[in-house]
From Swiss-Prot:
One of its GO terms (biological process) is hydrogen peroxide catabolic process. This is Hemoglobin subunit alpha. The lineage of its organism: Eukaryota, Metazoa, Chordata, Craniata, Vertebrata. O2 binds at H59. The keyword Zinc does not apply. The modification Phosphothreonine is found at T9, T109, T135, T138. Keywords: Acetylation, Heme, Iron, Metal-binding, Oxygen transport, Phosphoprotein, Transport. SUPFAM superfamilies: Globin-like (SSF46458).
Amino acid sequence: MVLSAADKTNVKAAWSKVGGHAGEYGAEALERMFLGFPTTKTYFPHFDLSHGSAQVKAHGKKVGDALTLAVGHLDDLPGALSNLSDLHAHKLRVDPVNFKLLSHCLLSTLAVHLPNDFTPAVHASLDKFLSSVSTVLTSKYR
């Protein structure tokens, strides 16, 4: 999915509001995913999945850091996320549908924390961005 200039502007502006909360929001989105889509827990059998768990927070930080990296490389998502794509496709073998589920939970989390900035246009741009990230992360499954 191609991000327009307006989408890129919206994504960068929204992510600038996330600021230093990327890891916190990533962890919250993971918790939402585990609660709303319990089958996703199967990829984390070694994690303490309880609310506020250090392991969920640590993985949330990884998610947040990866998205921050992606926002900084909107014109080259495949290059920026190549290592993560390899990891998820070849080592972790995460079912691609789970990226869509996490994206949904990330959008919900951002809507809660950025209510004044989460306009329909920003929502659409973030959805396209997360869809693009998901596409890149699943590109090496083939």
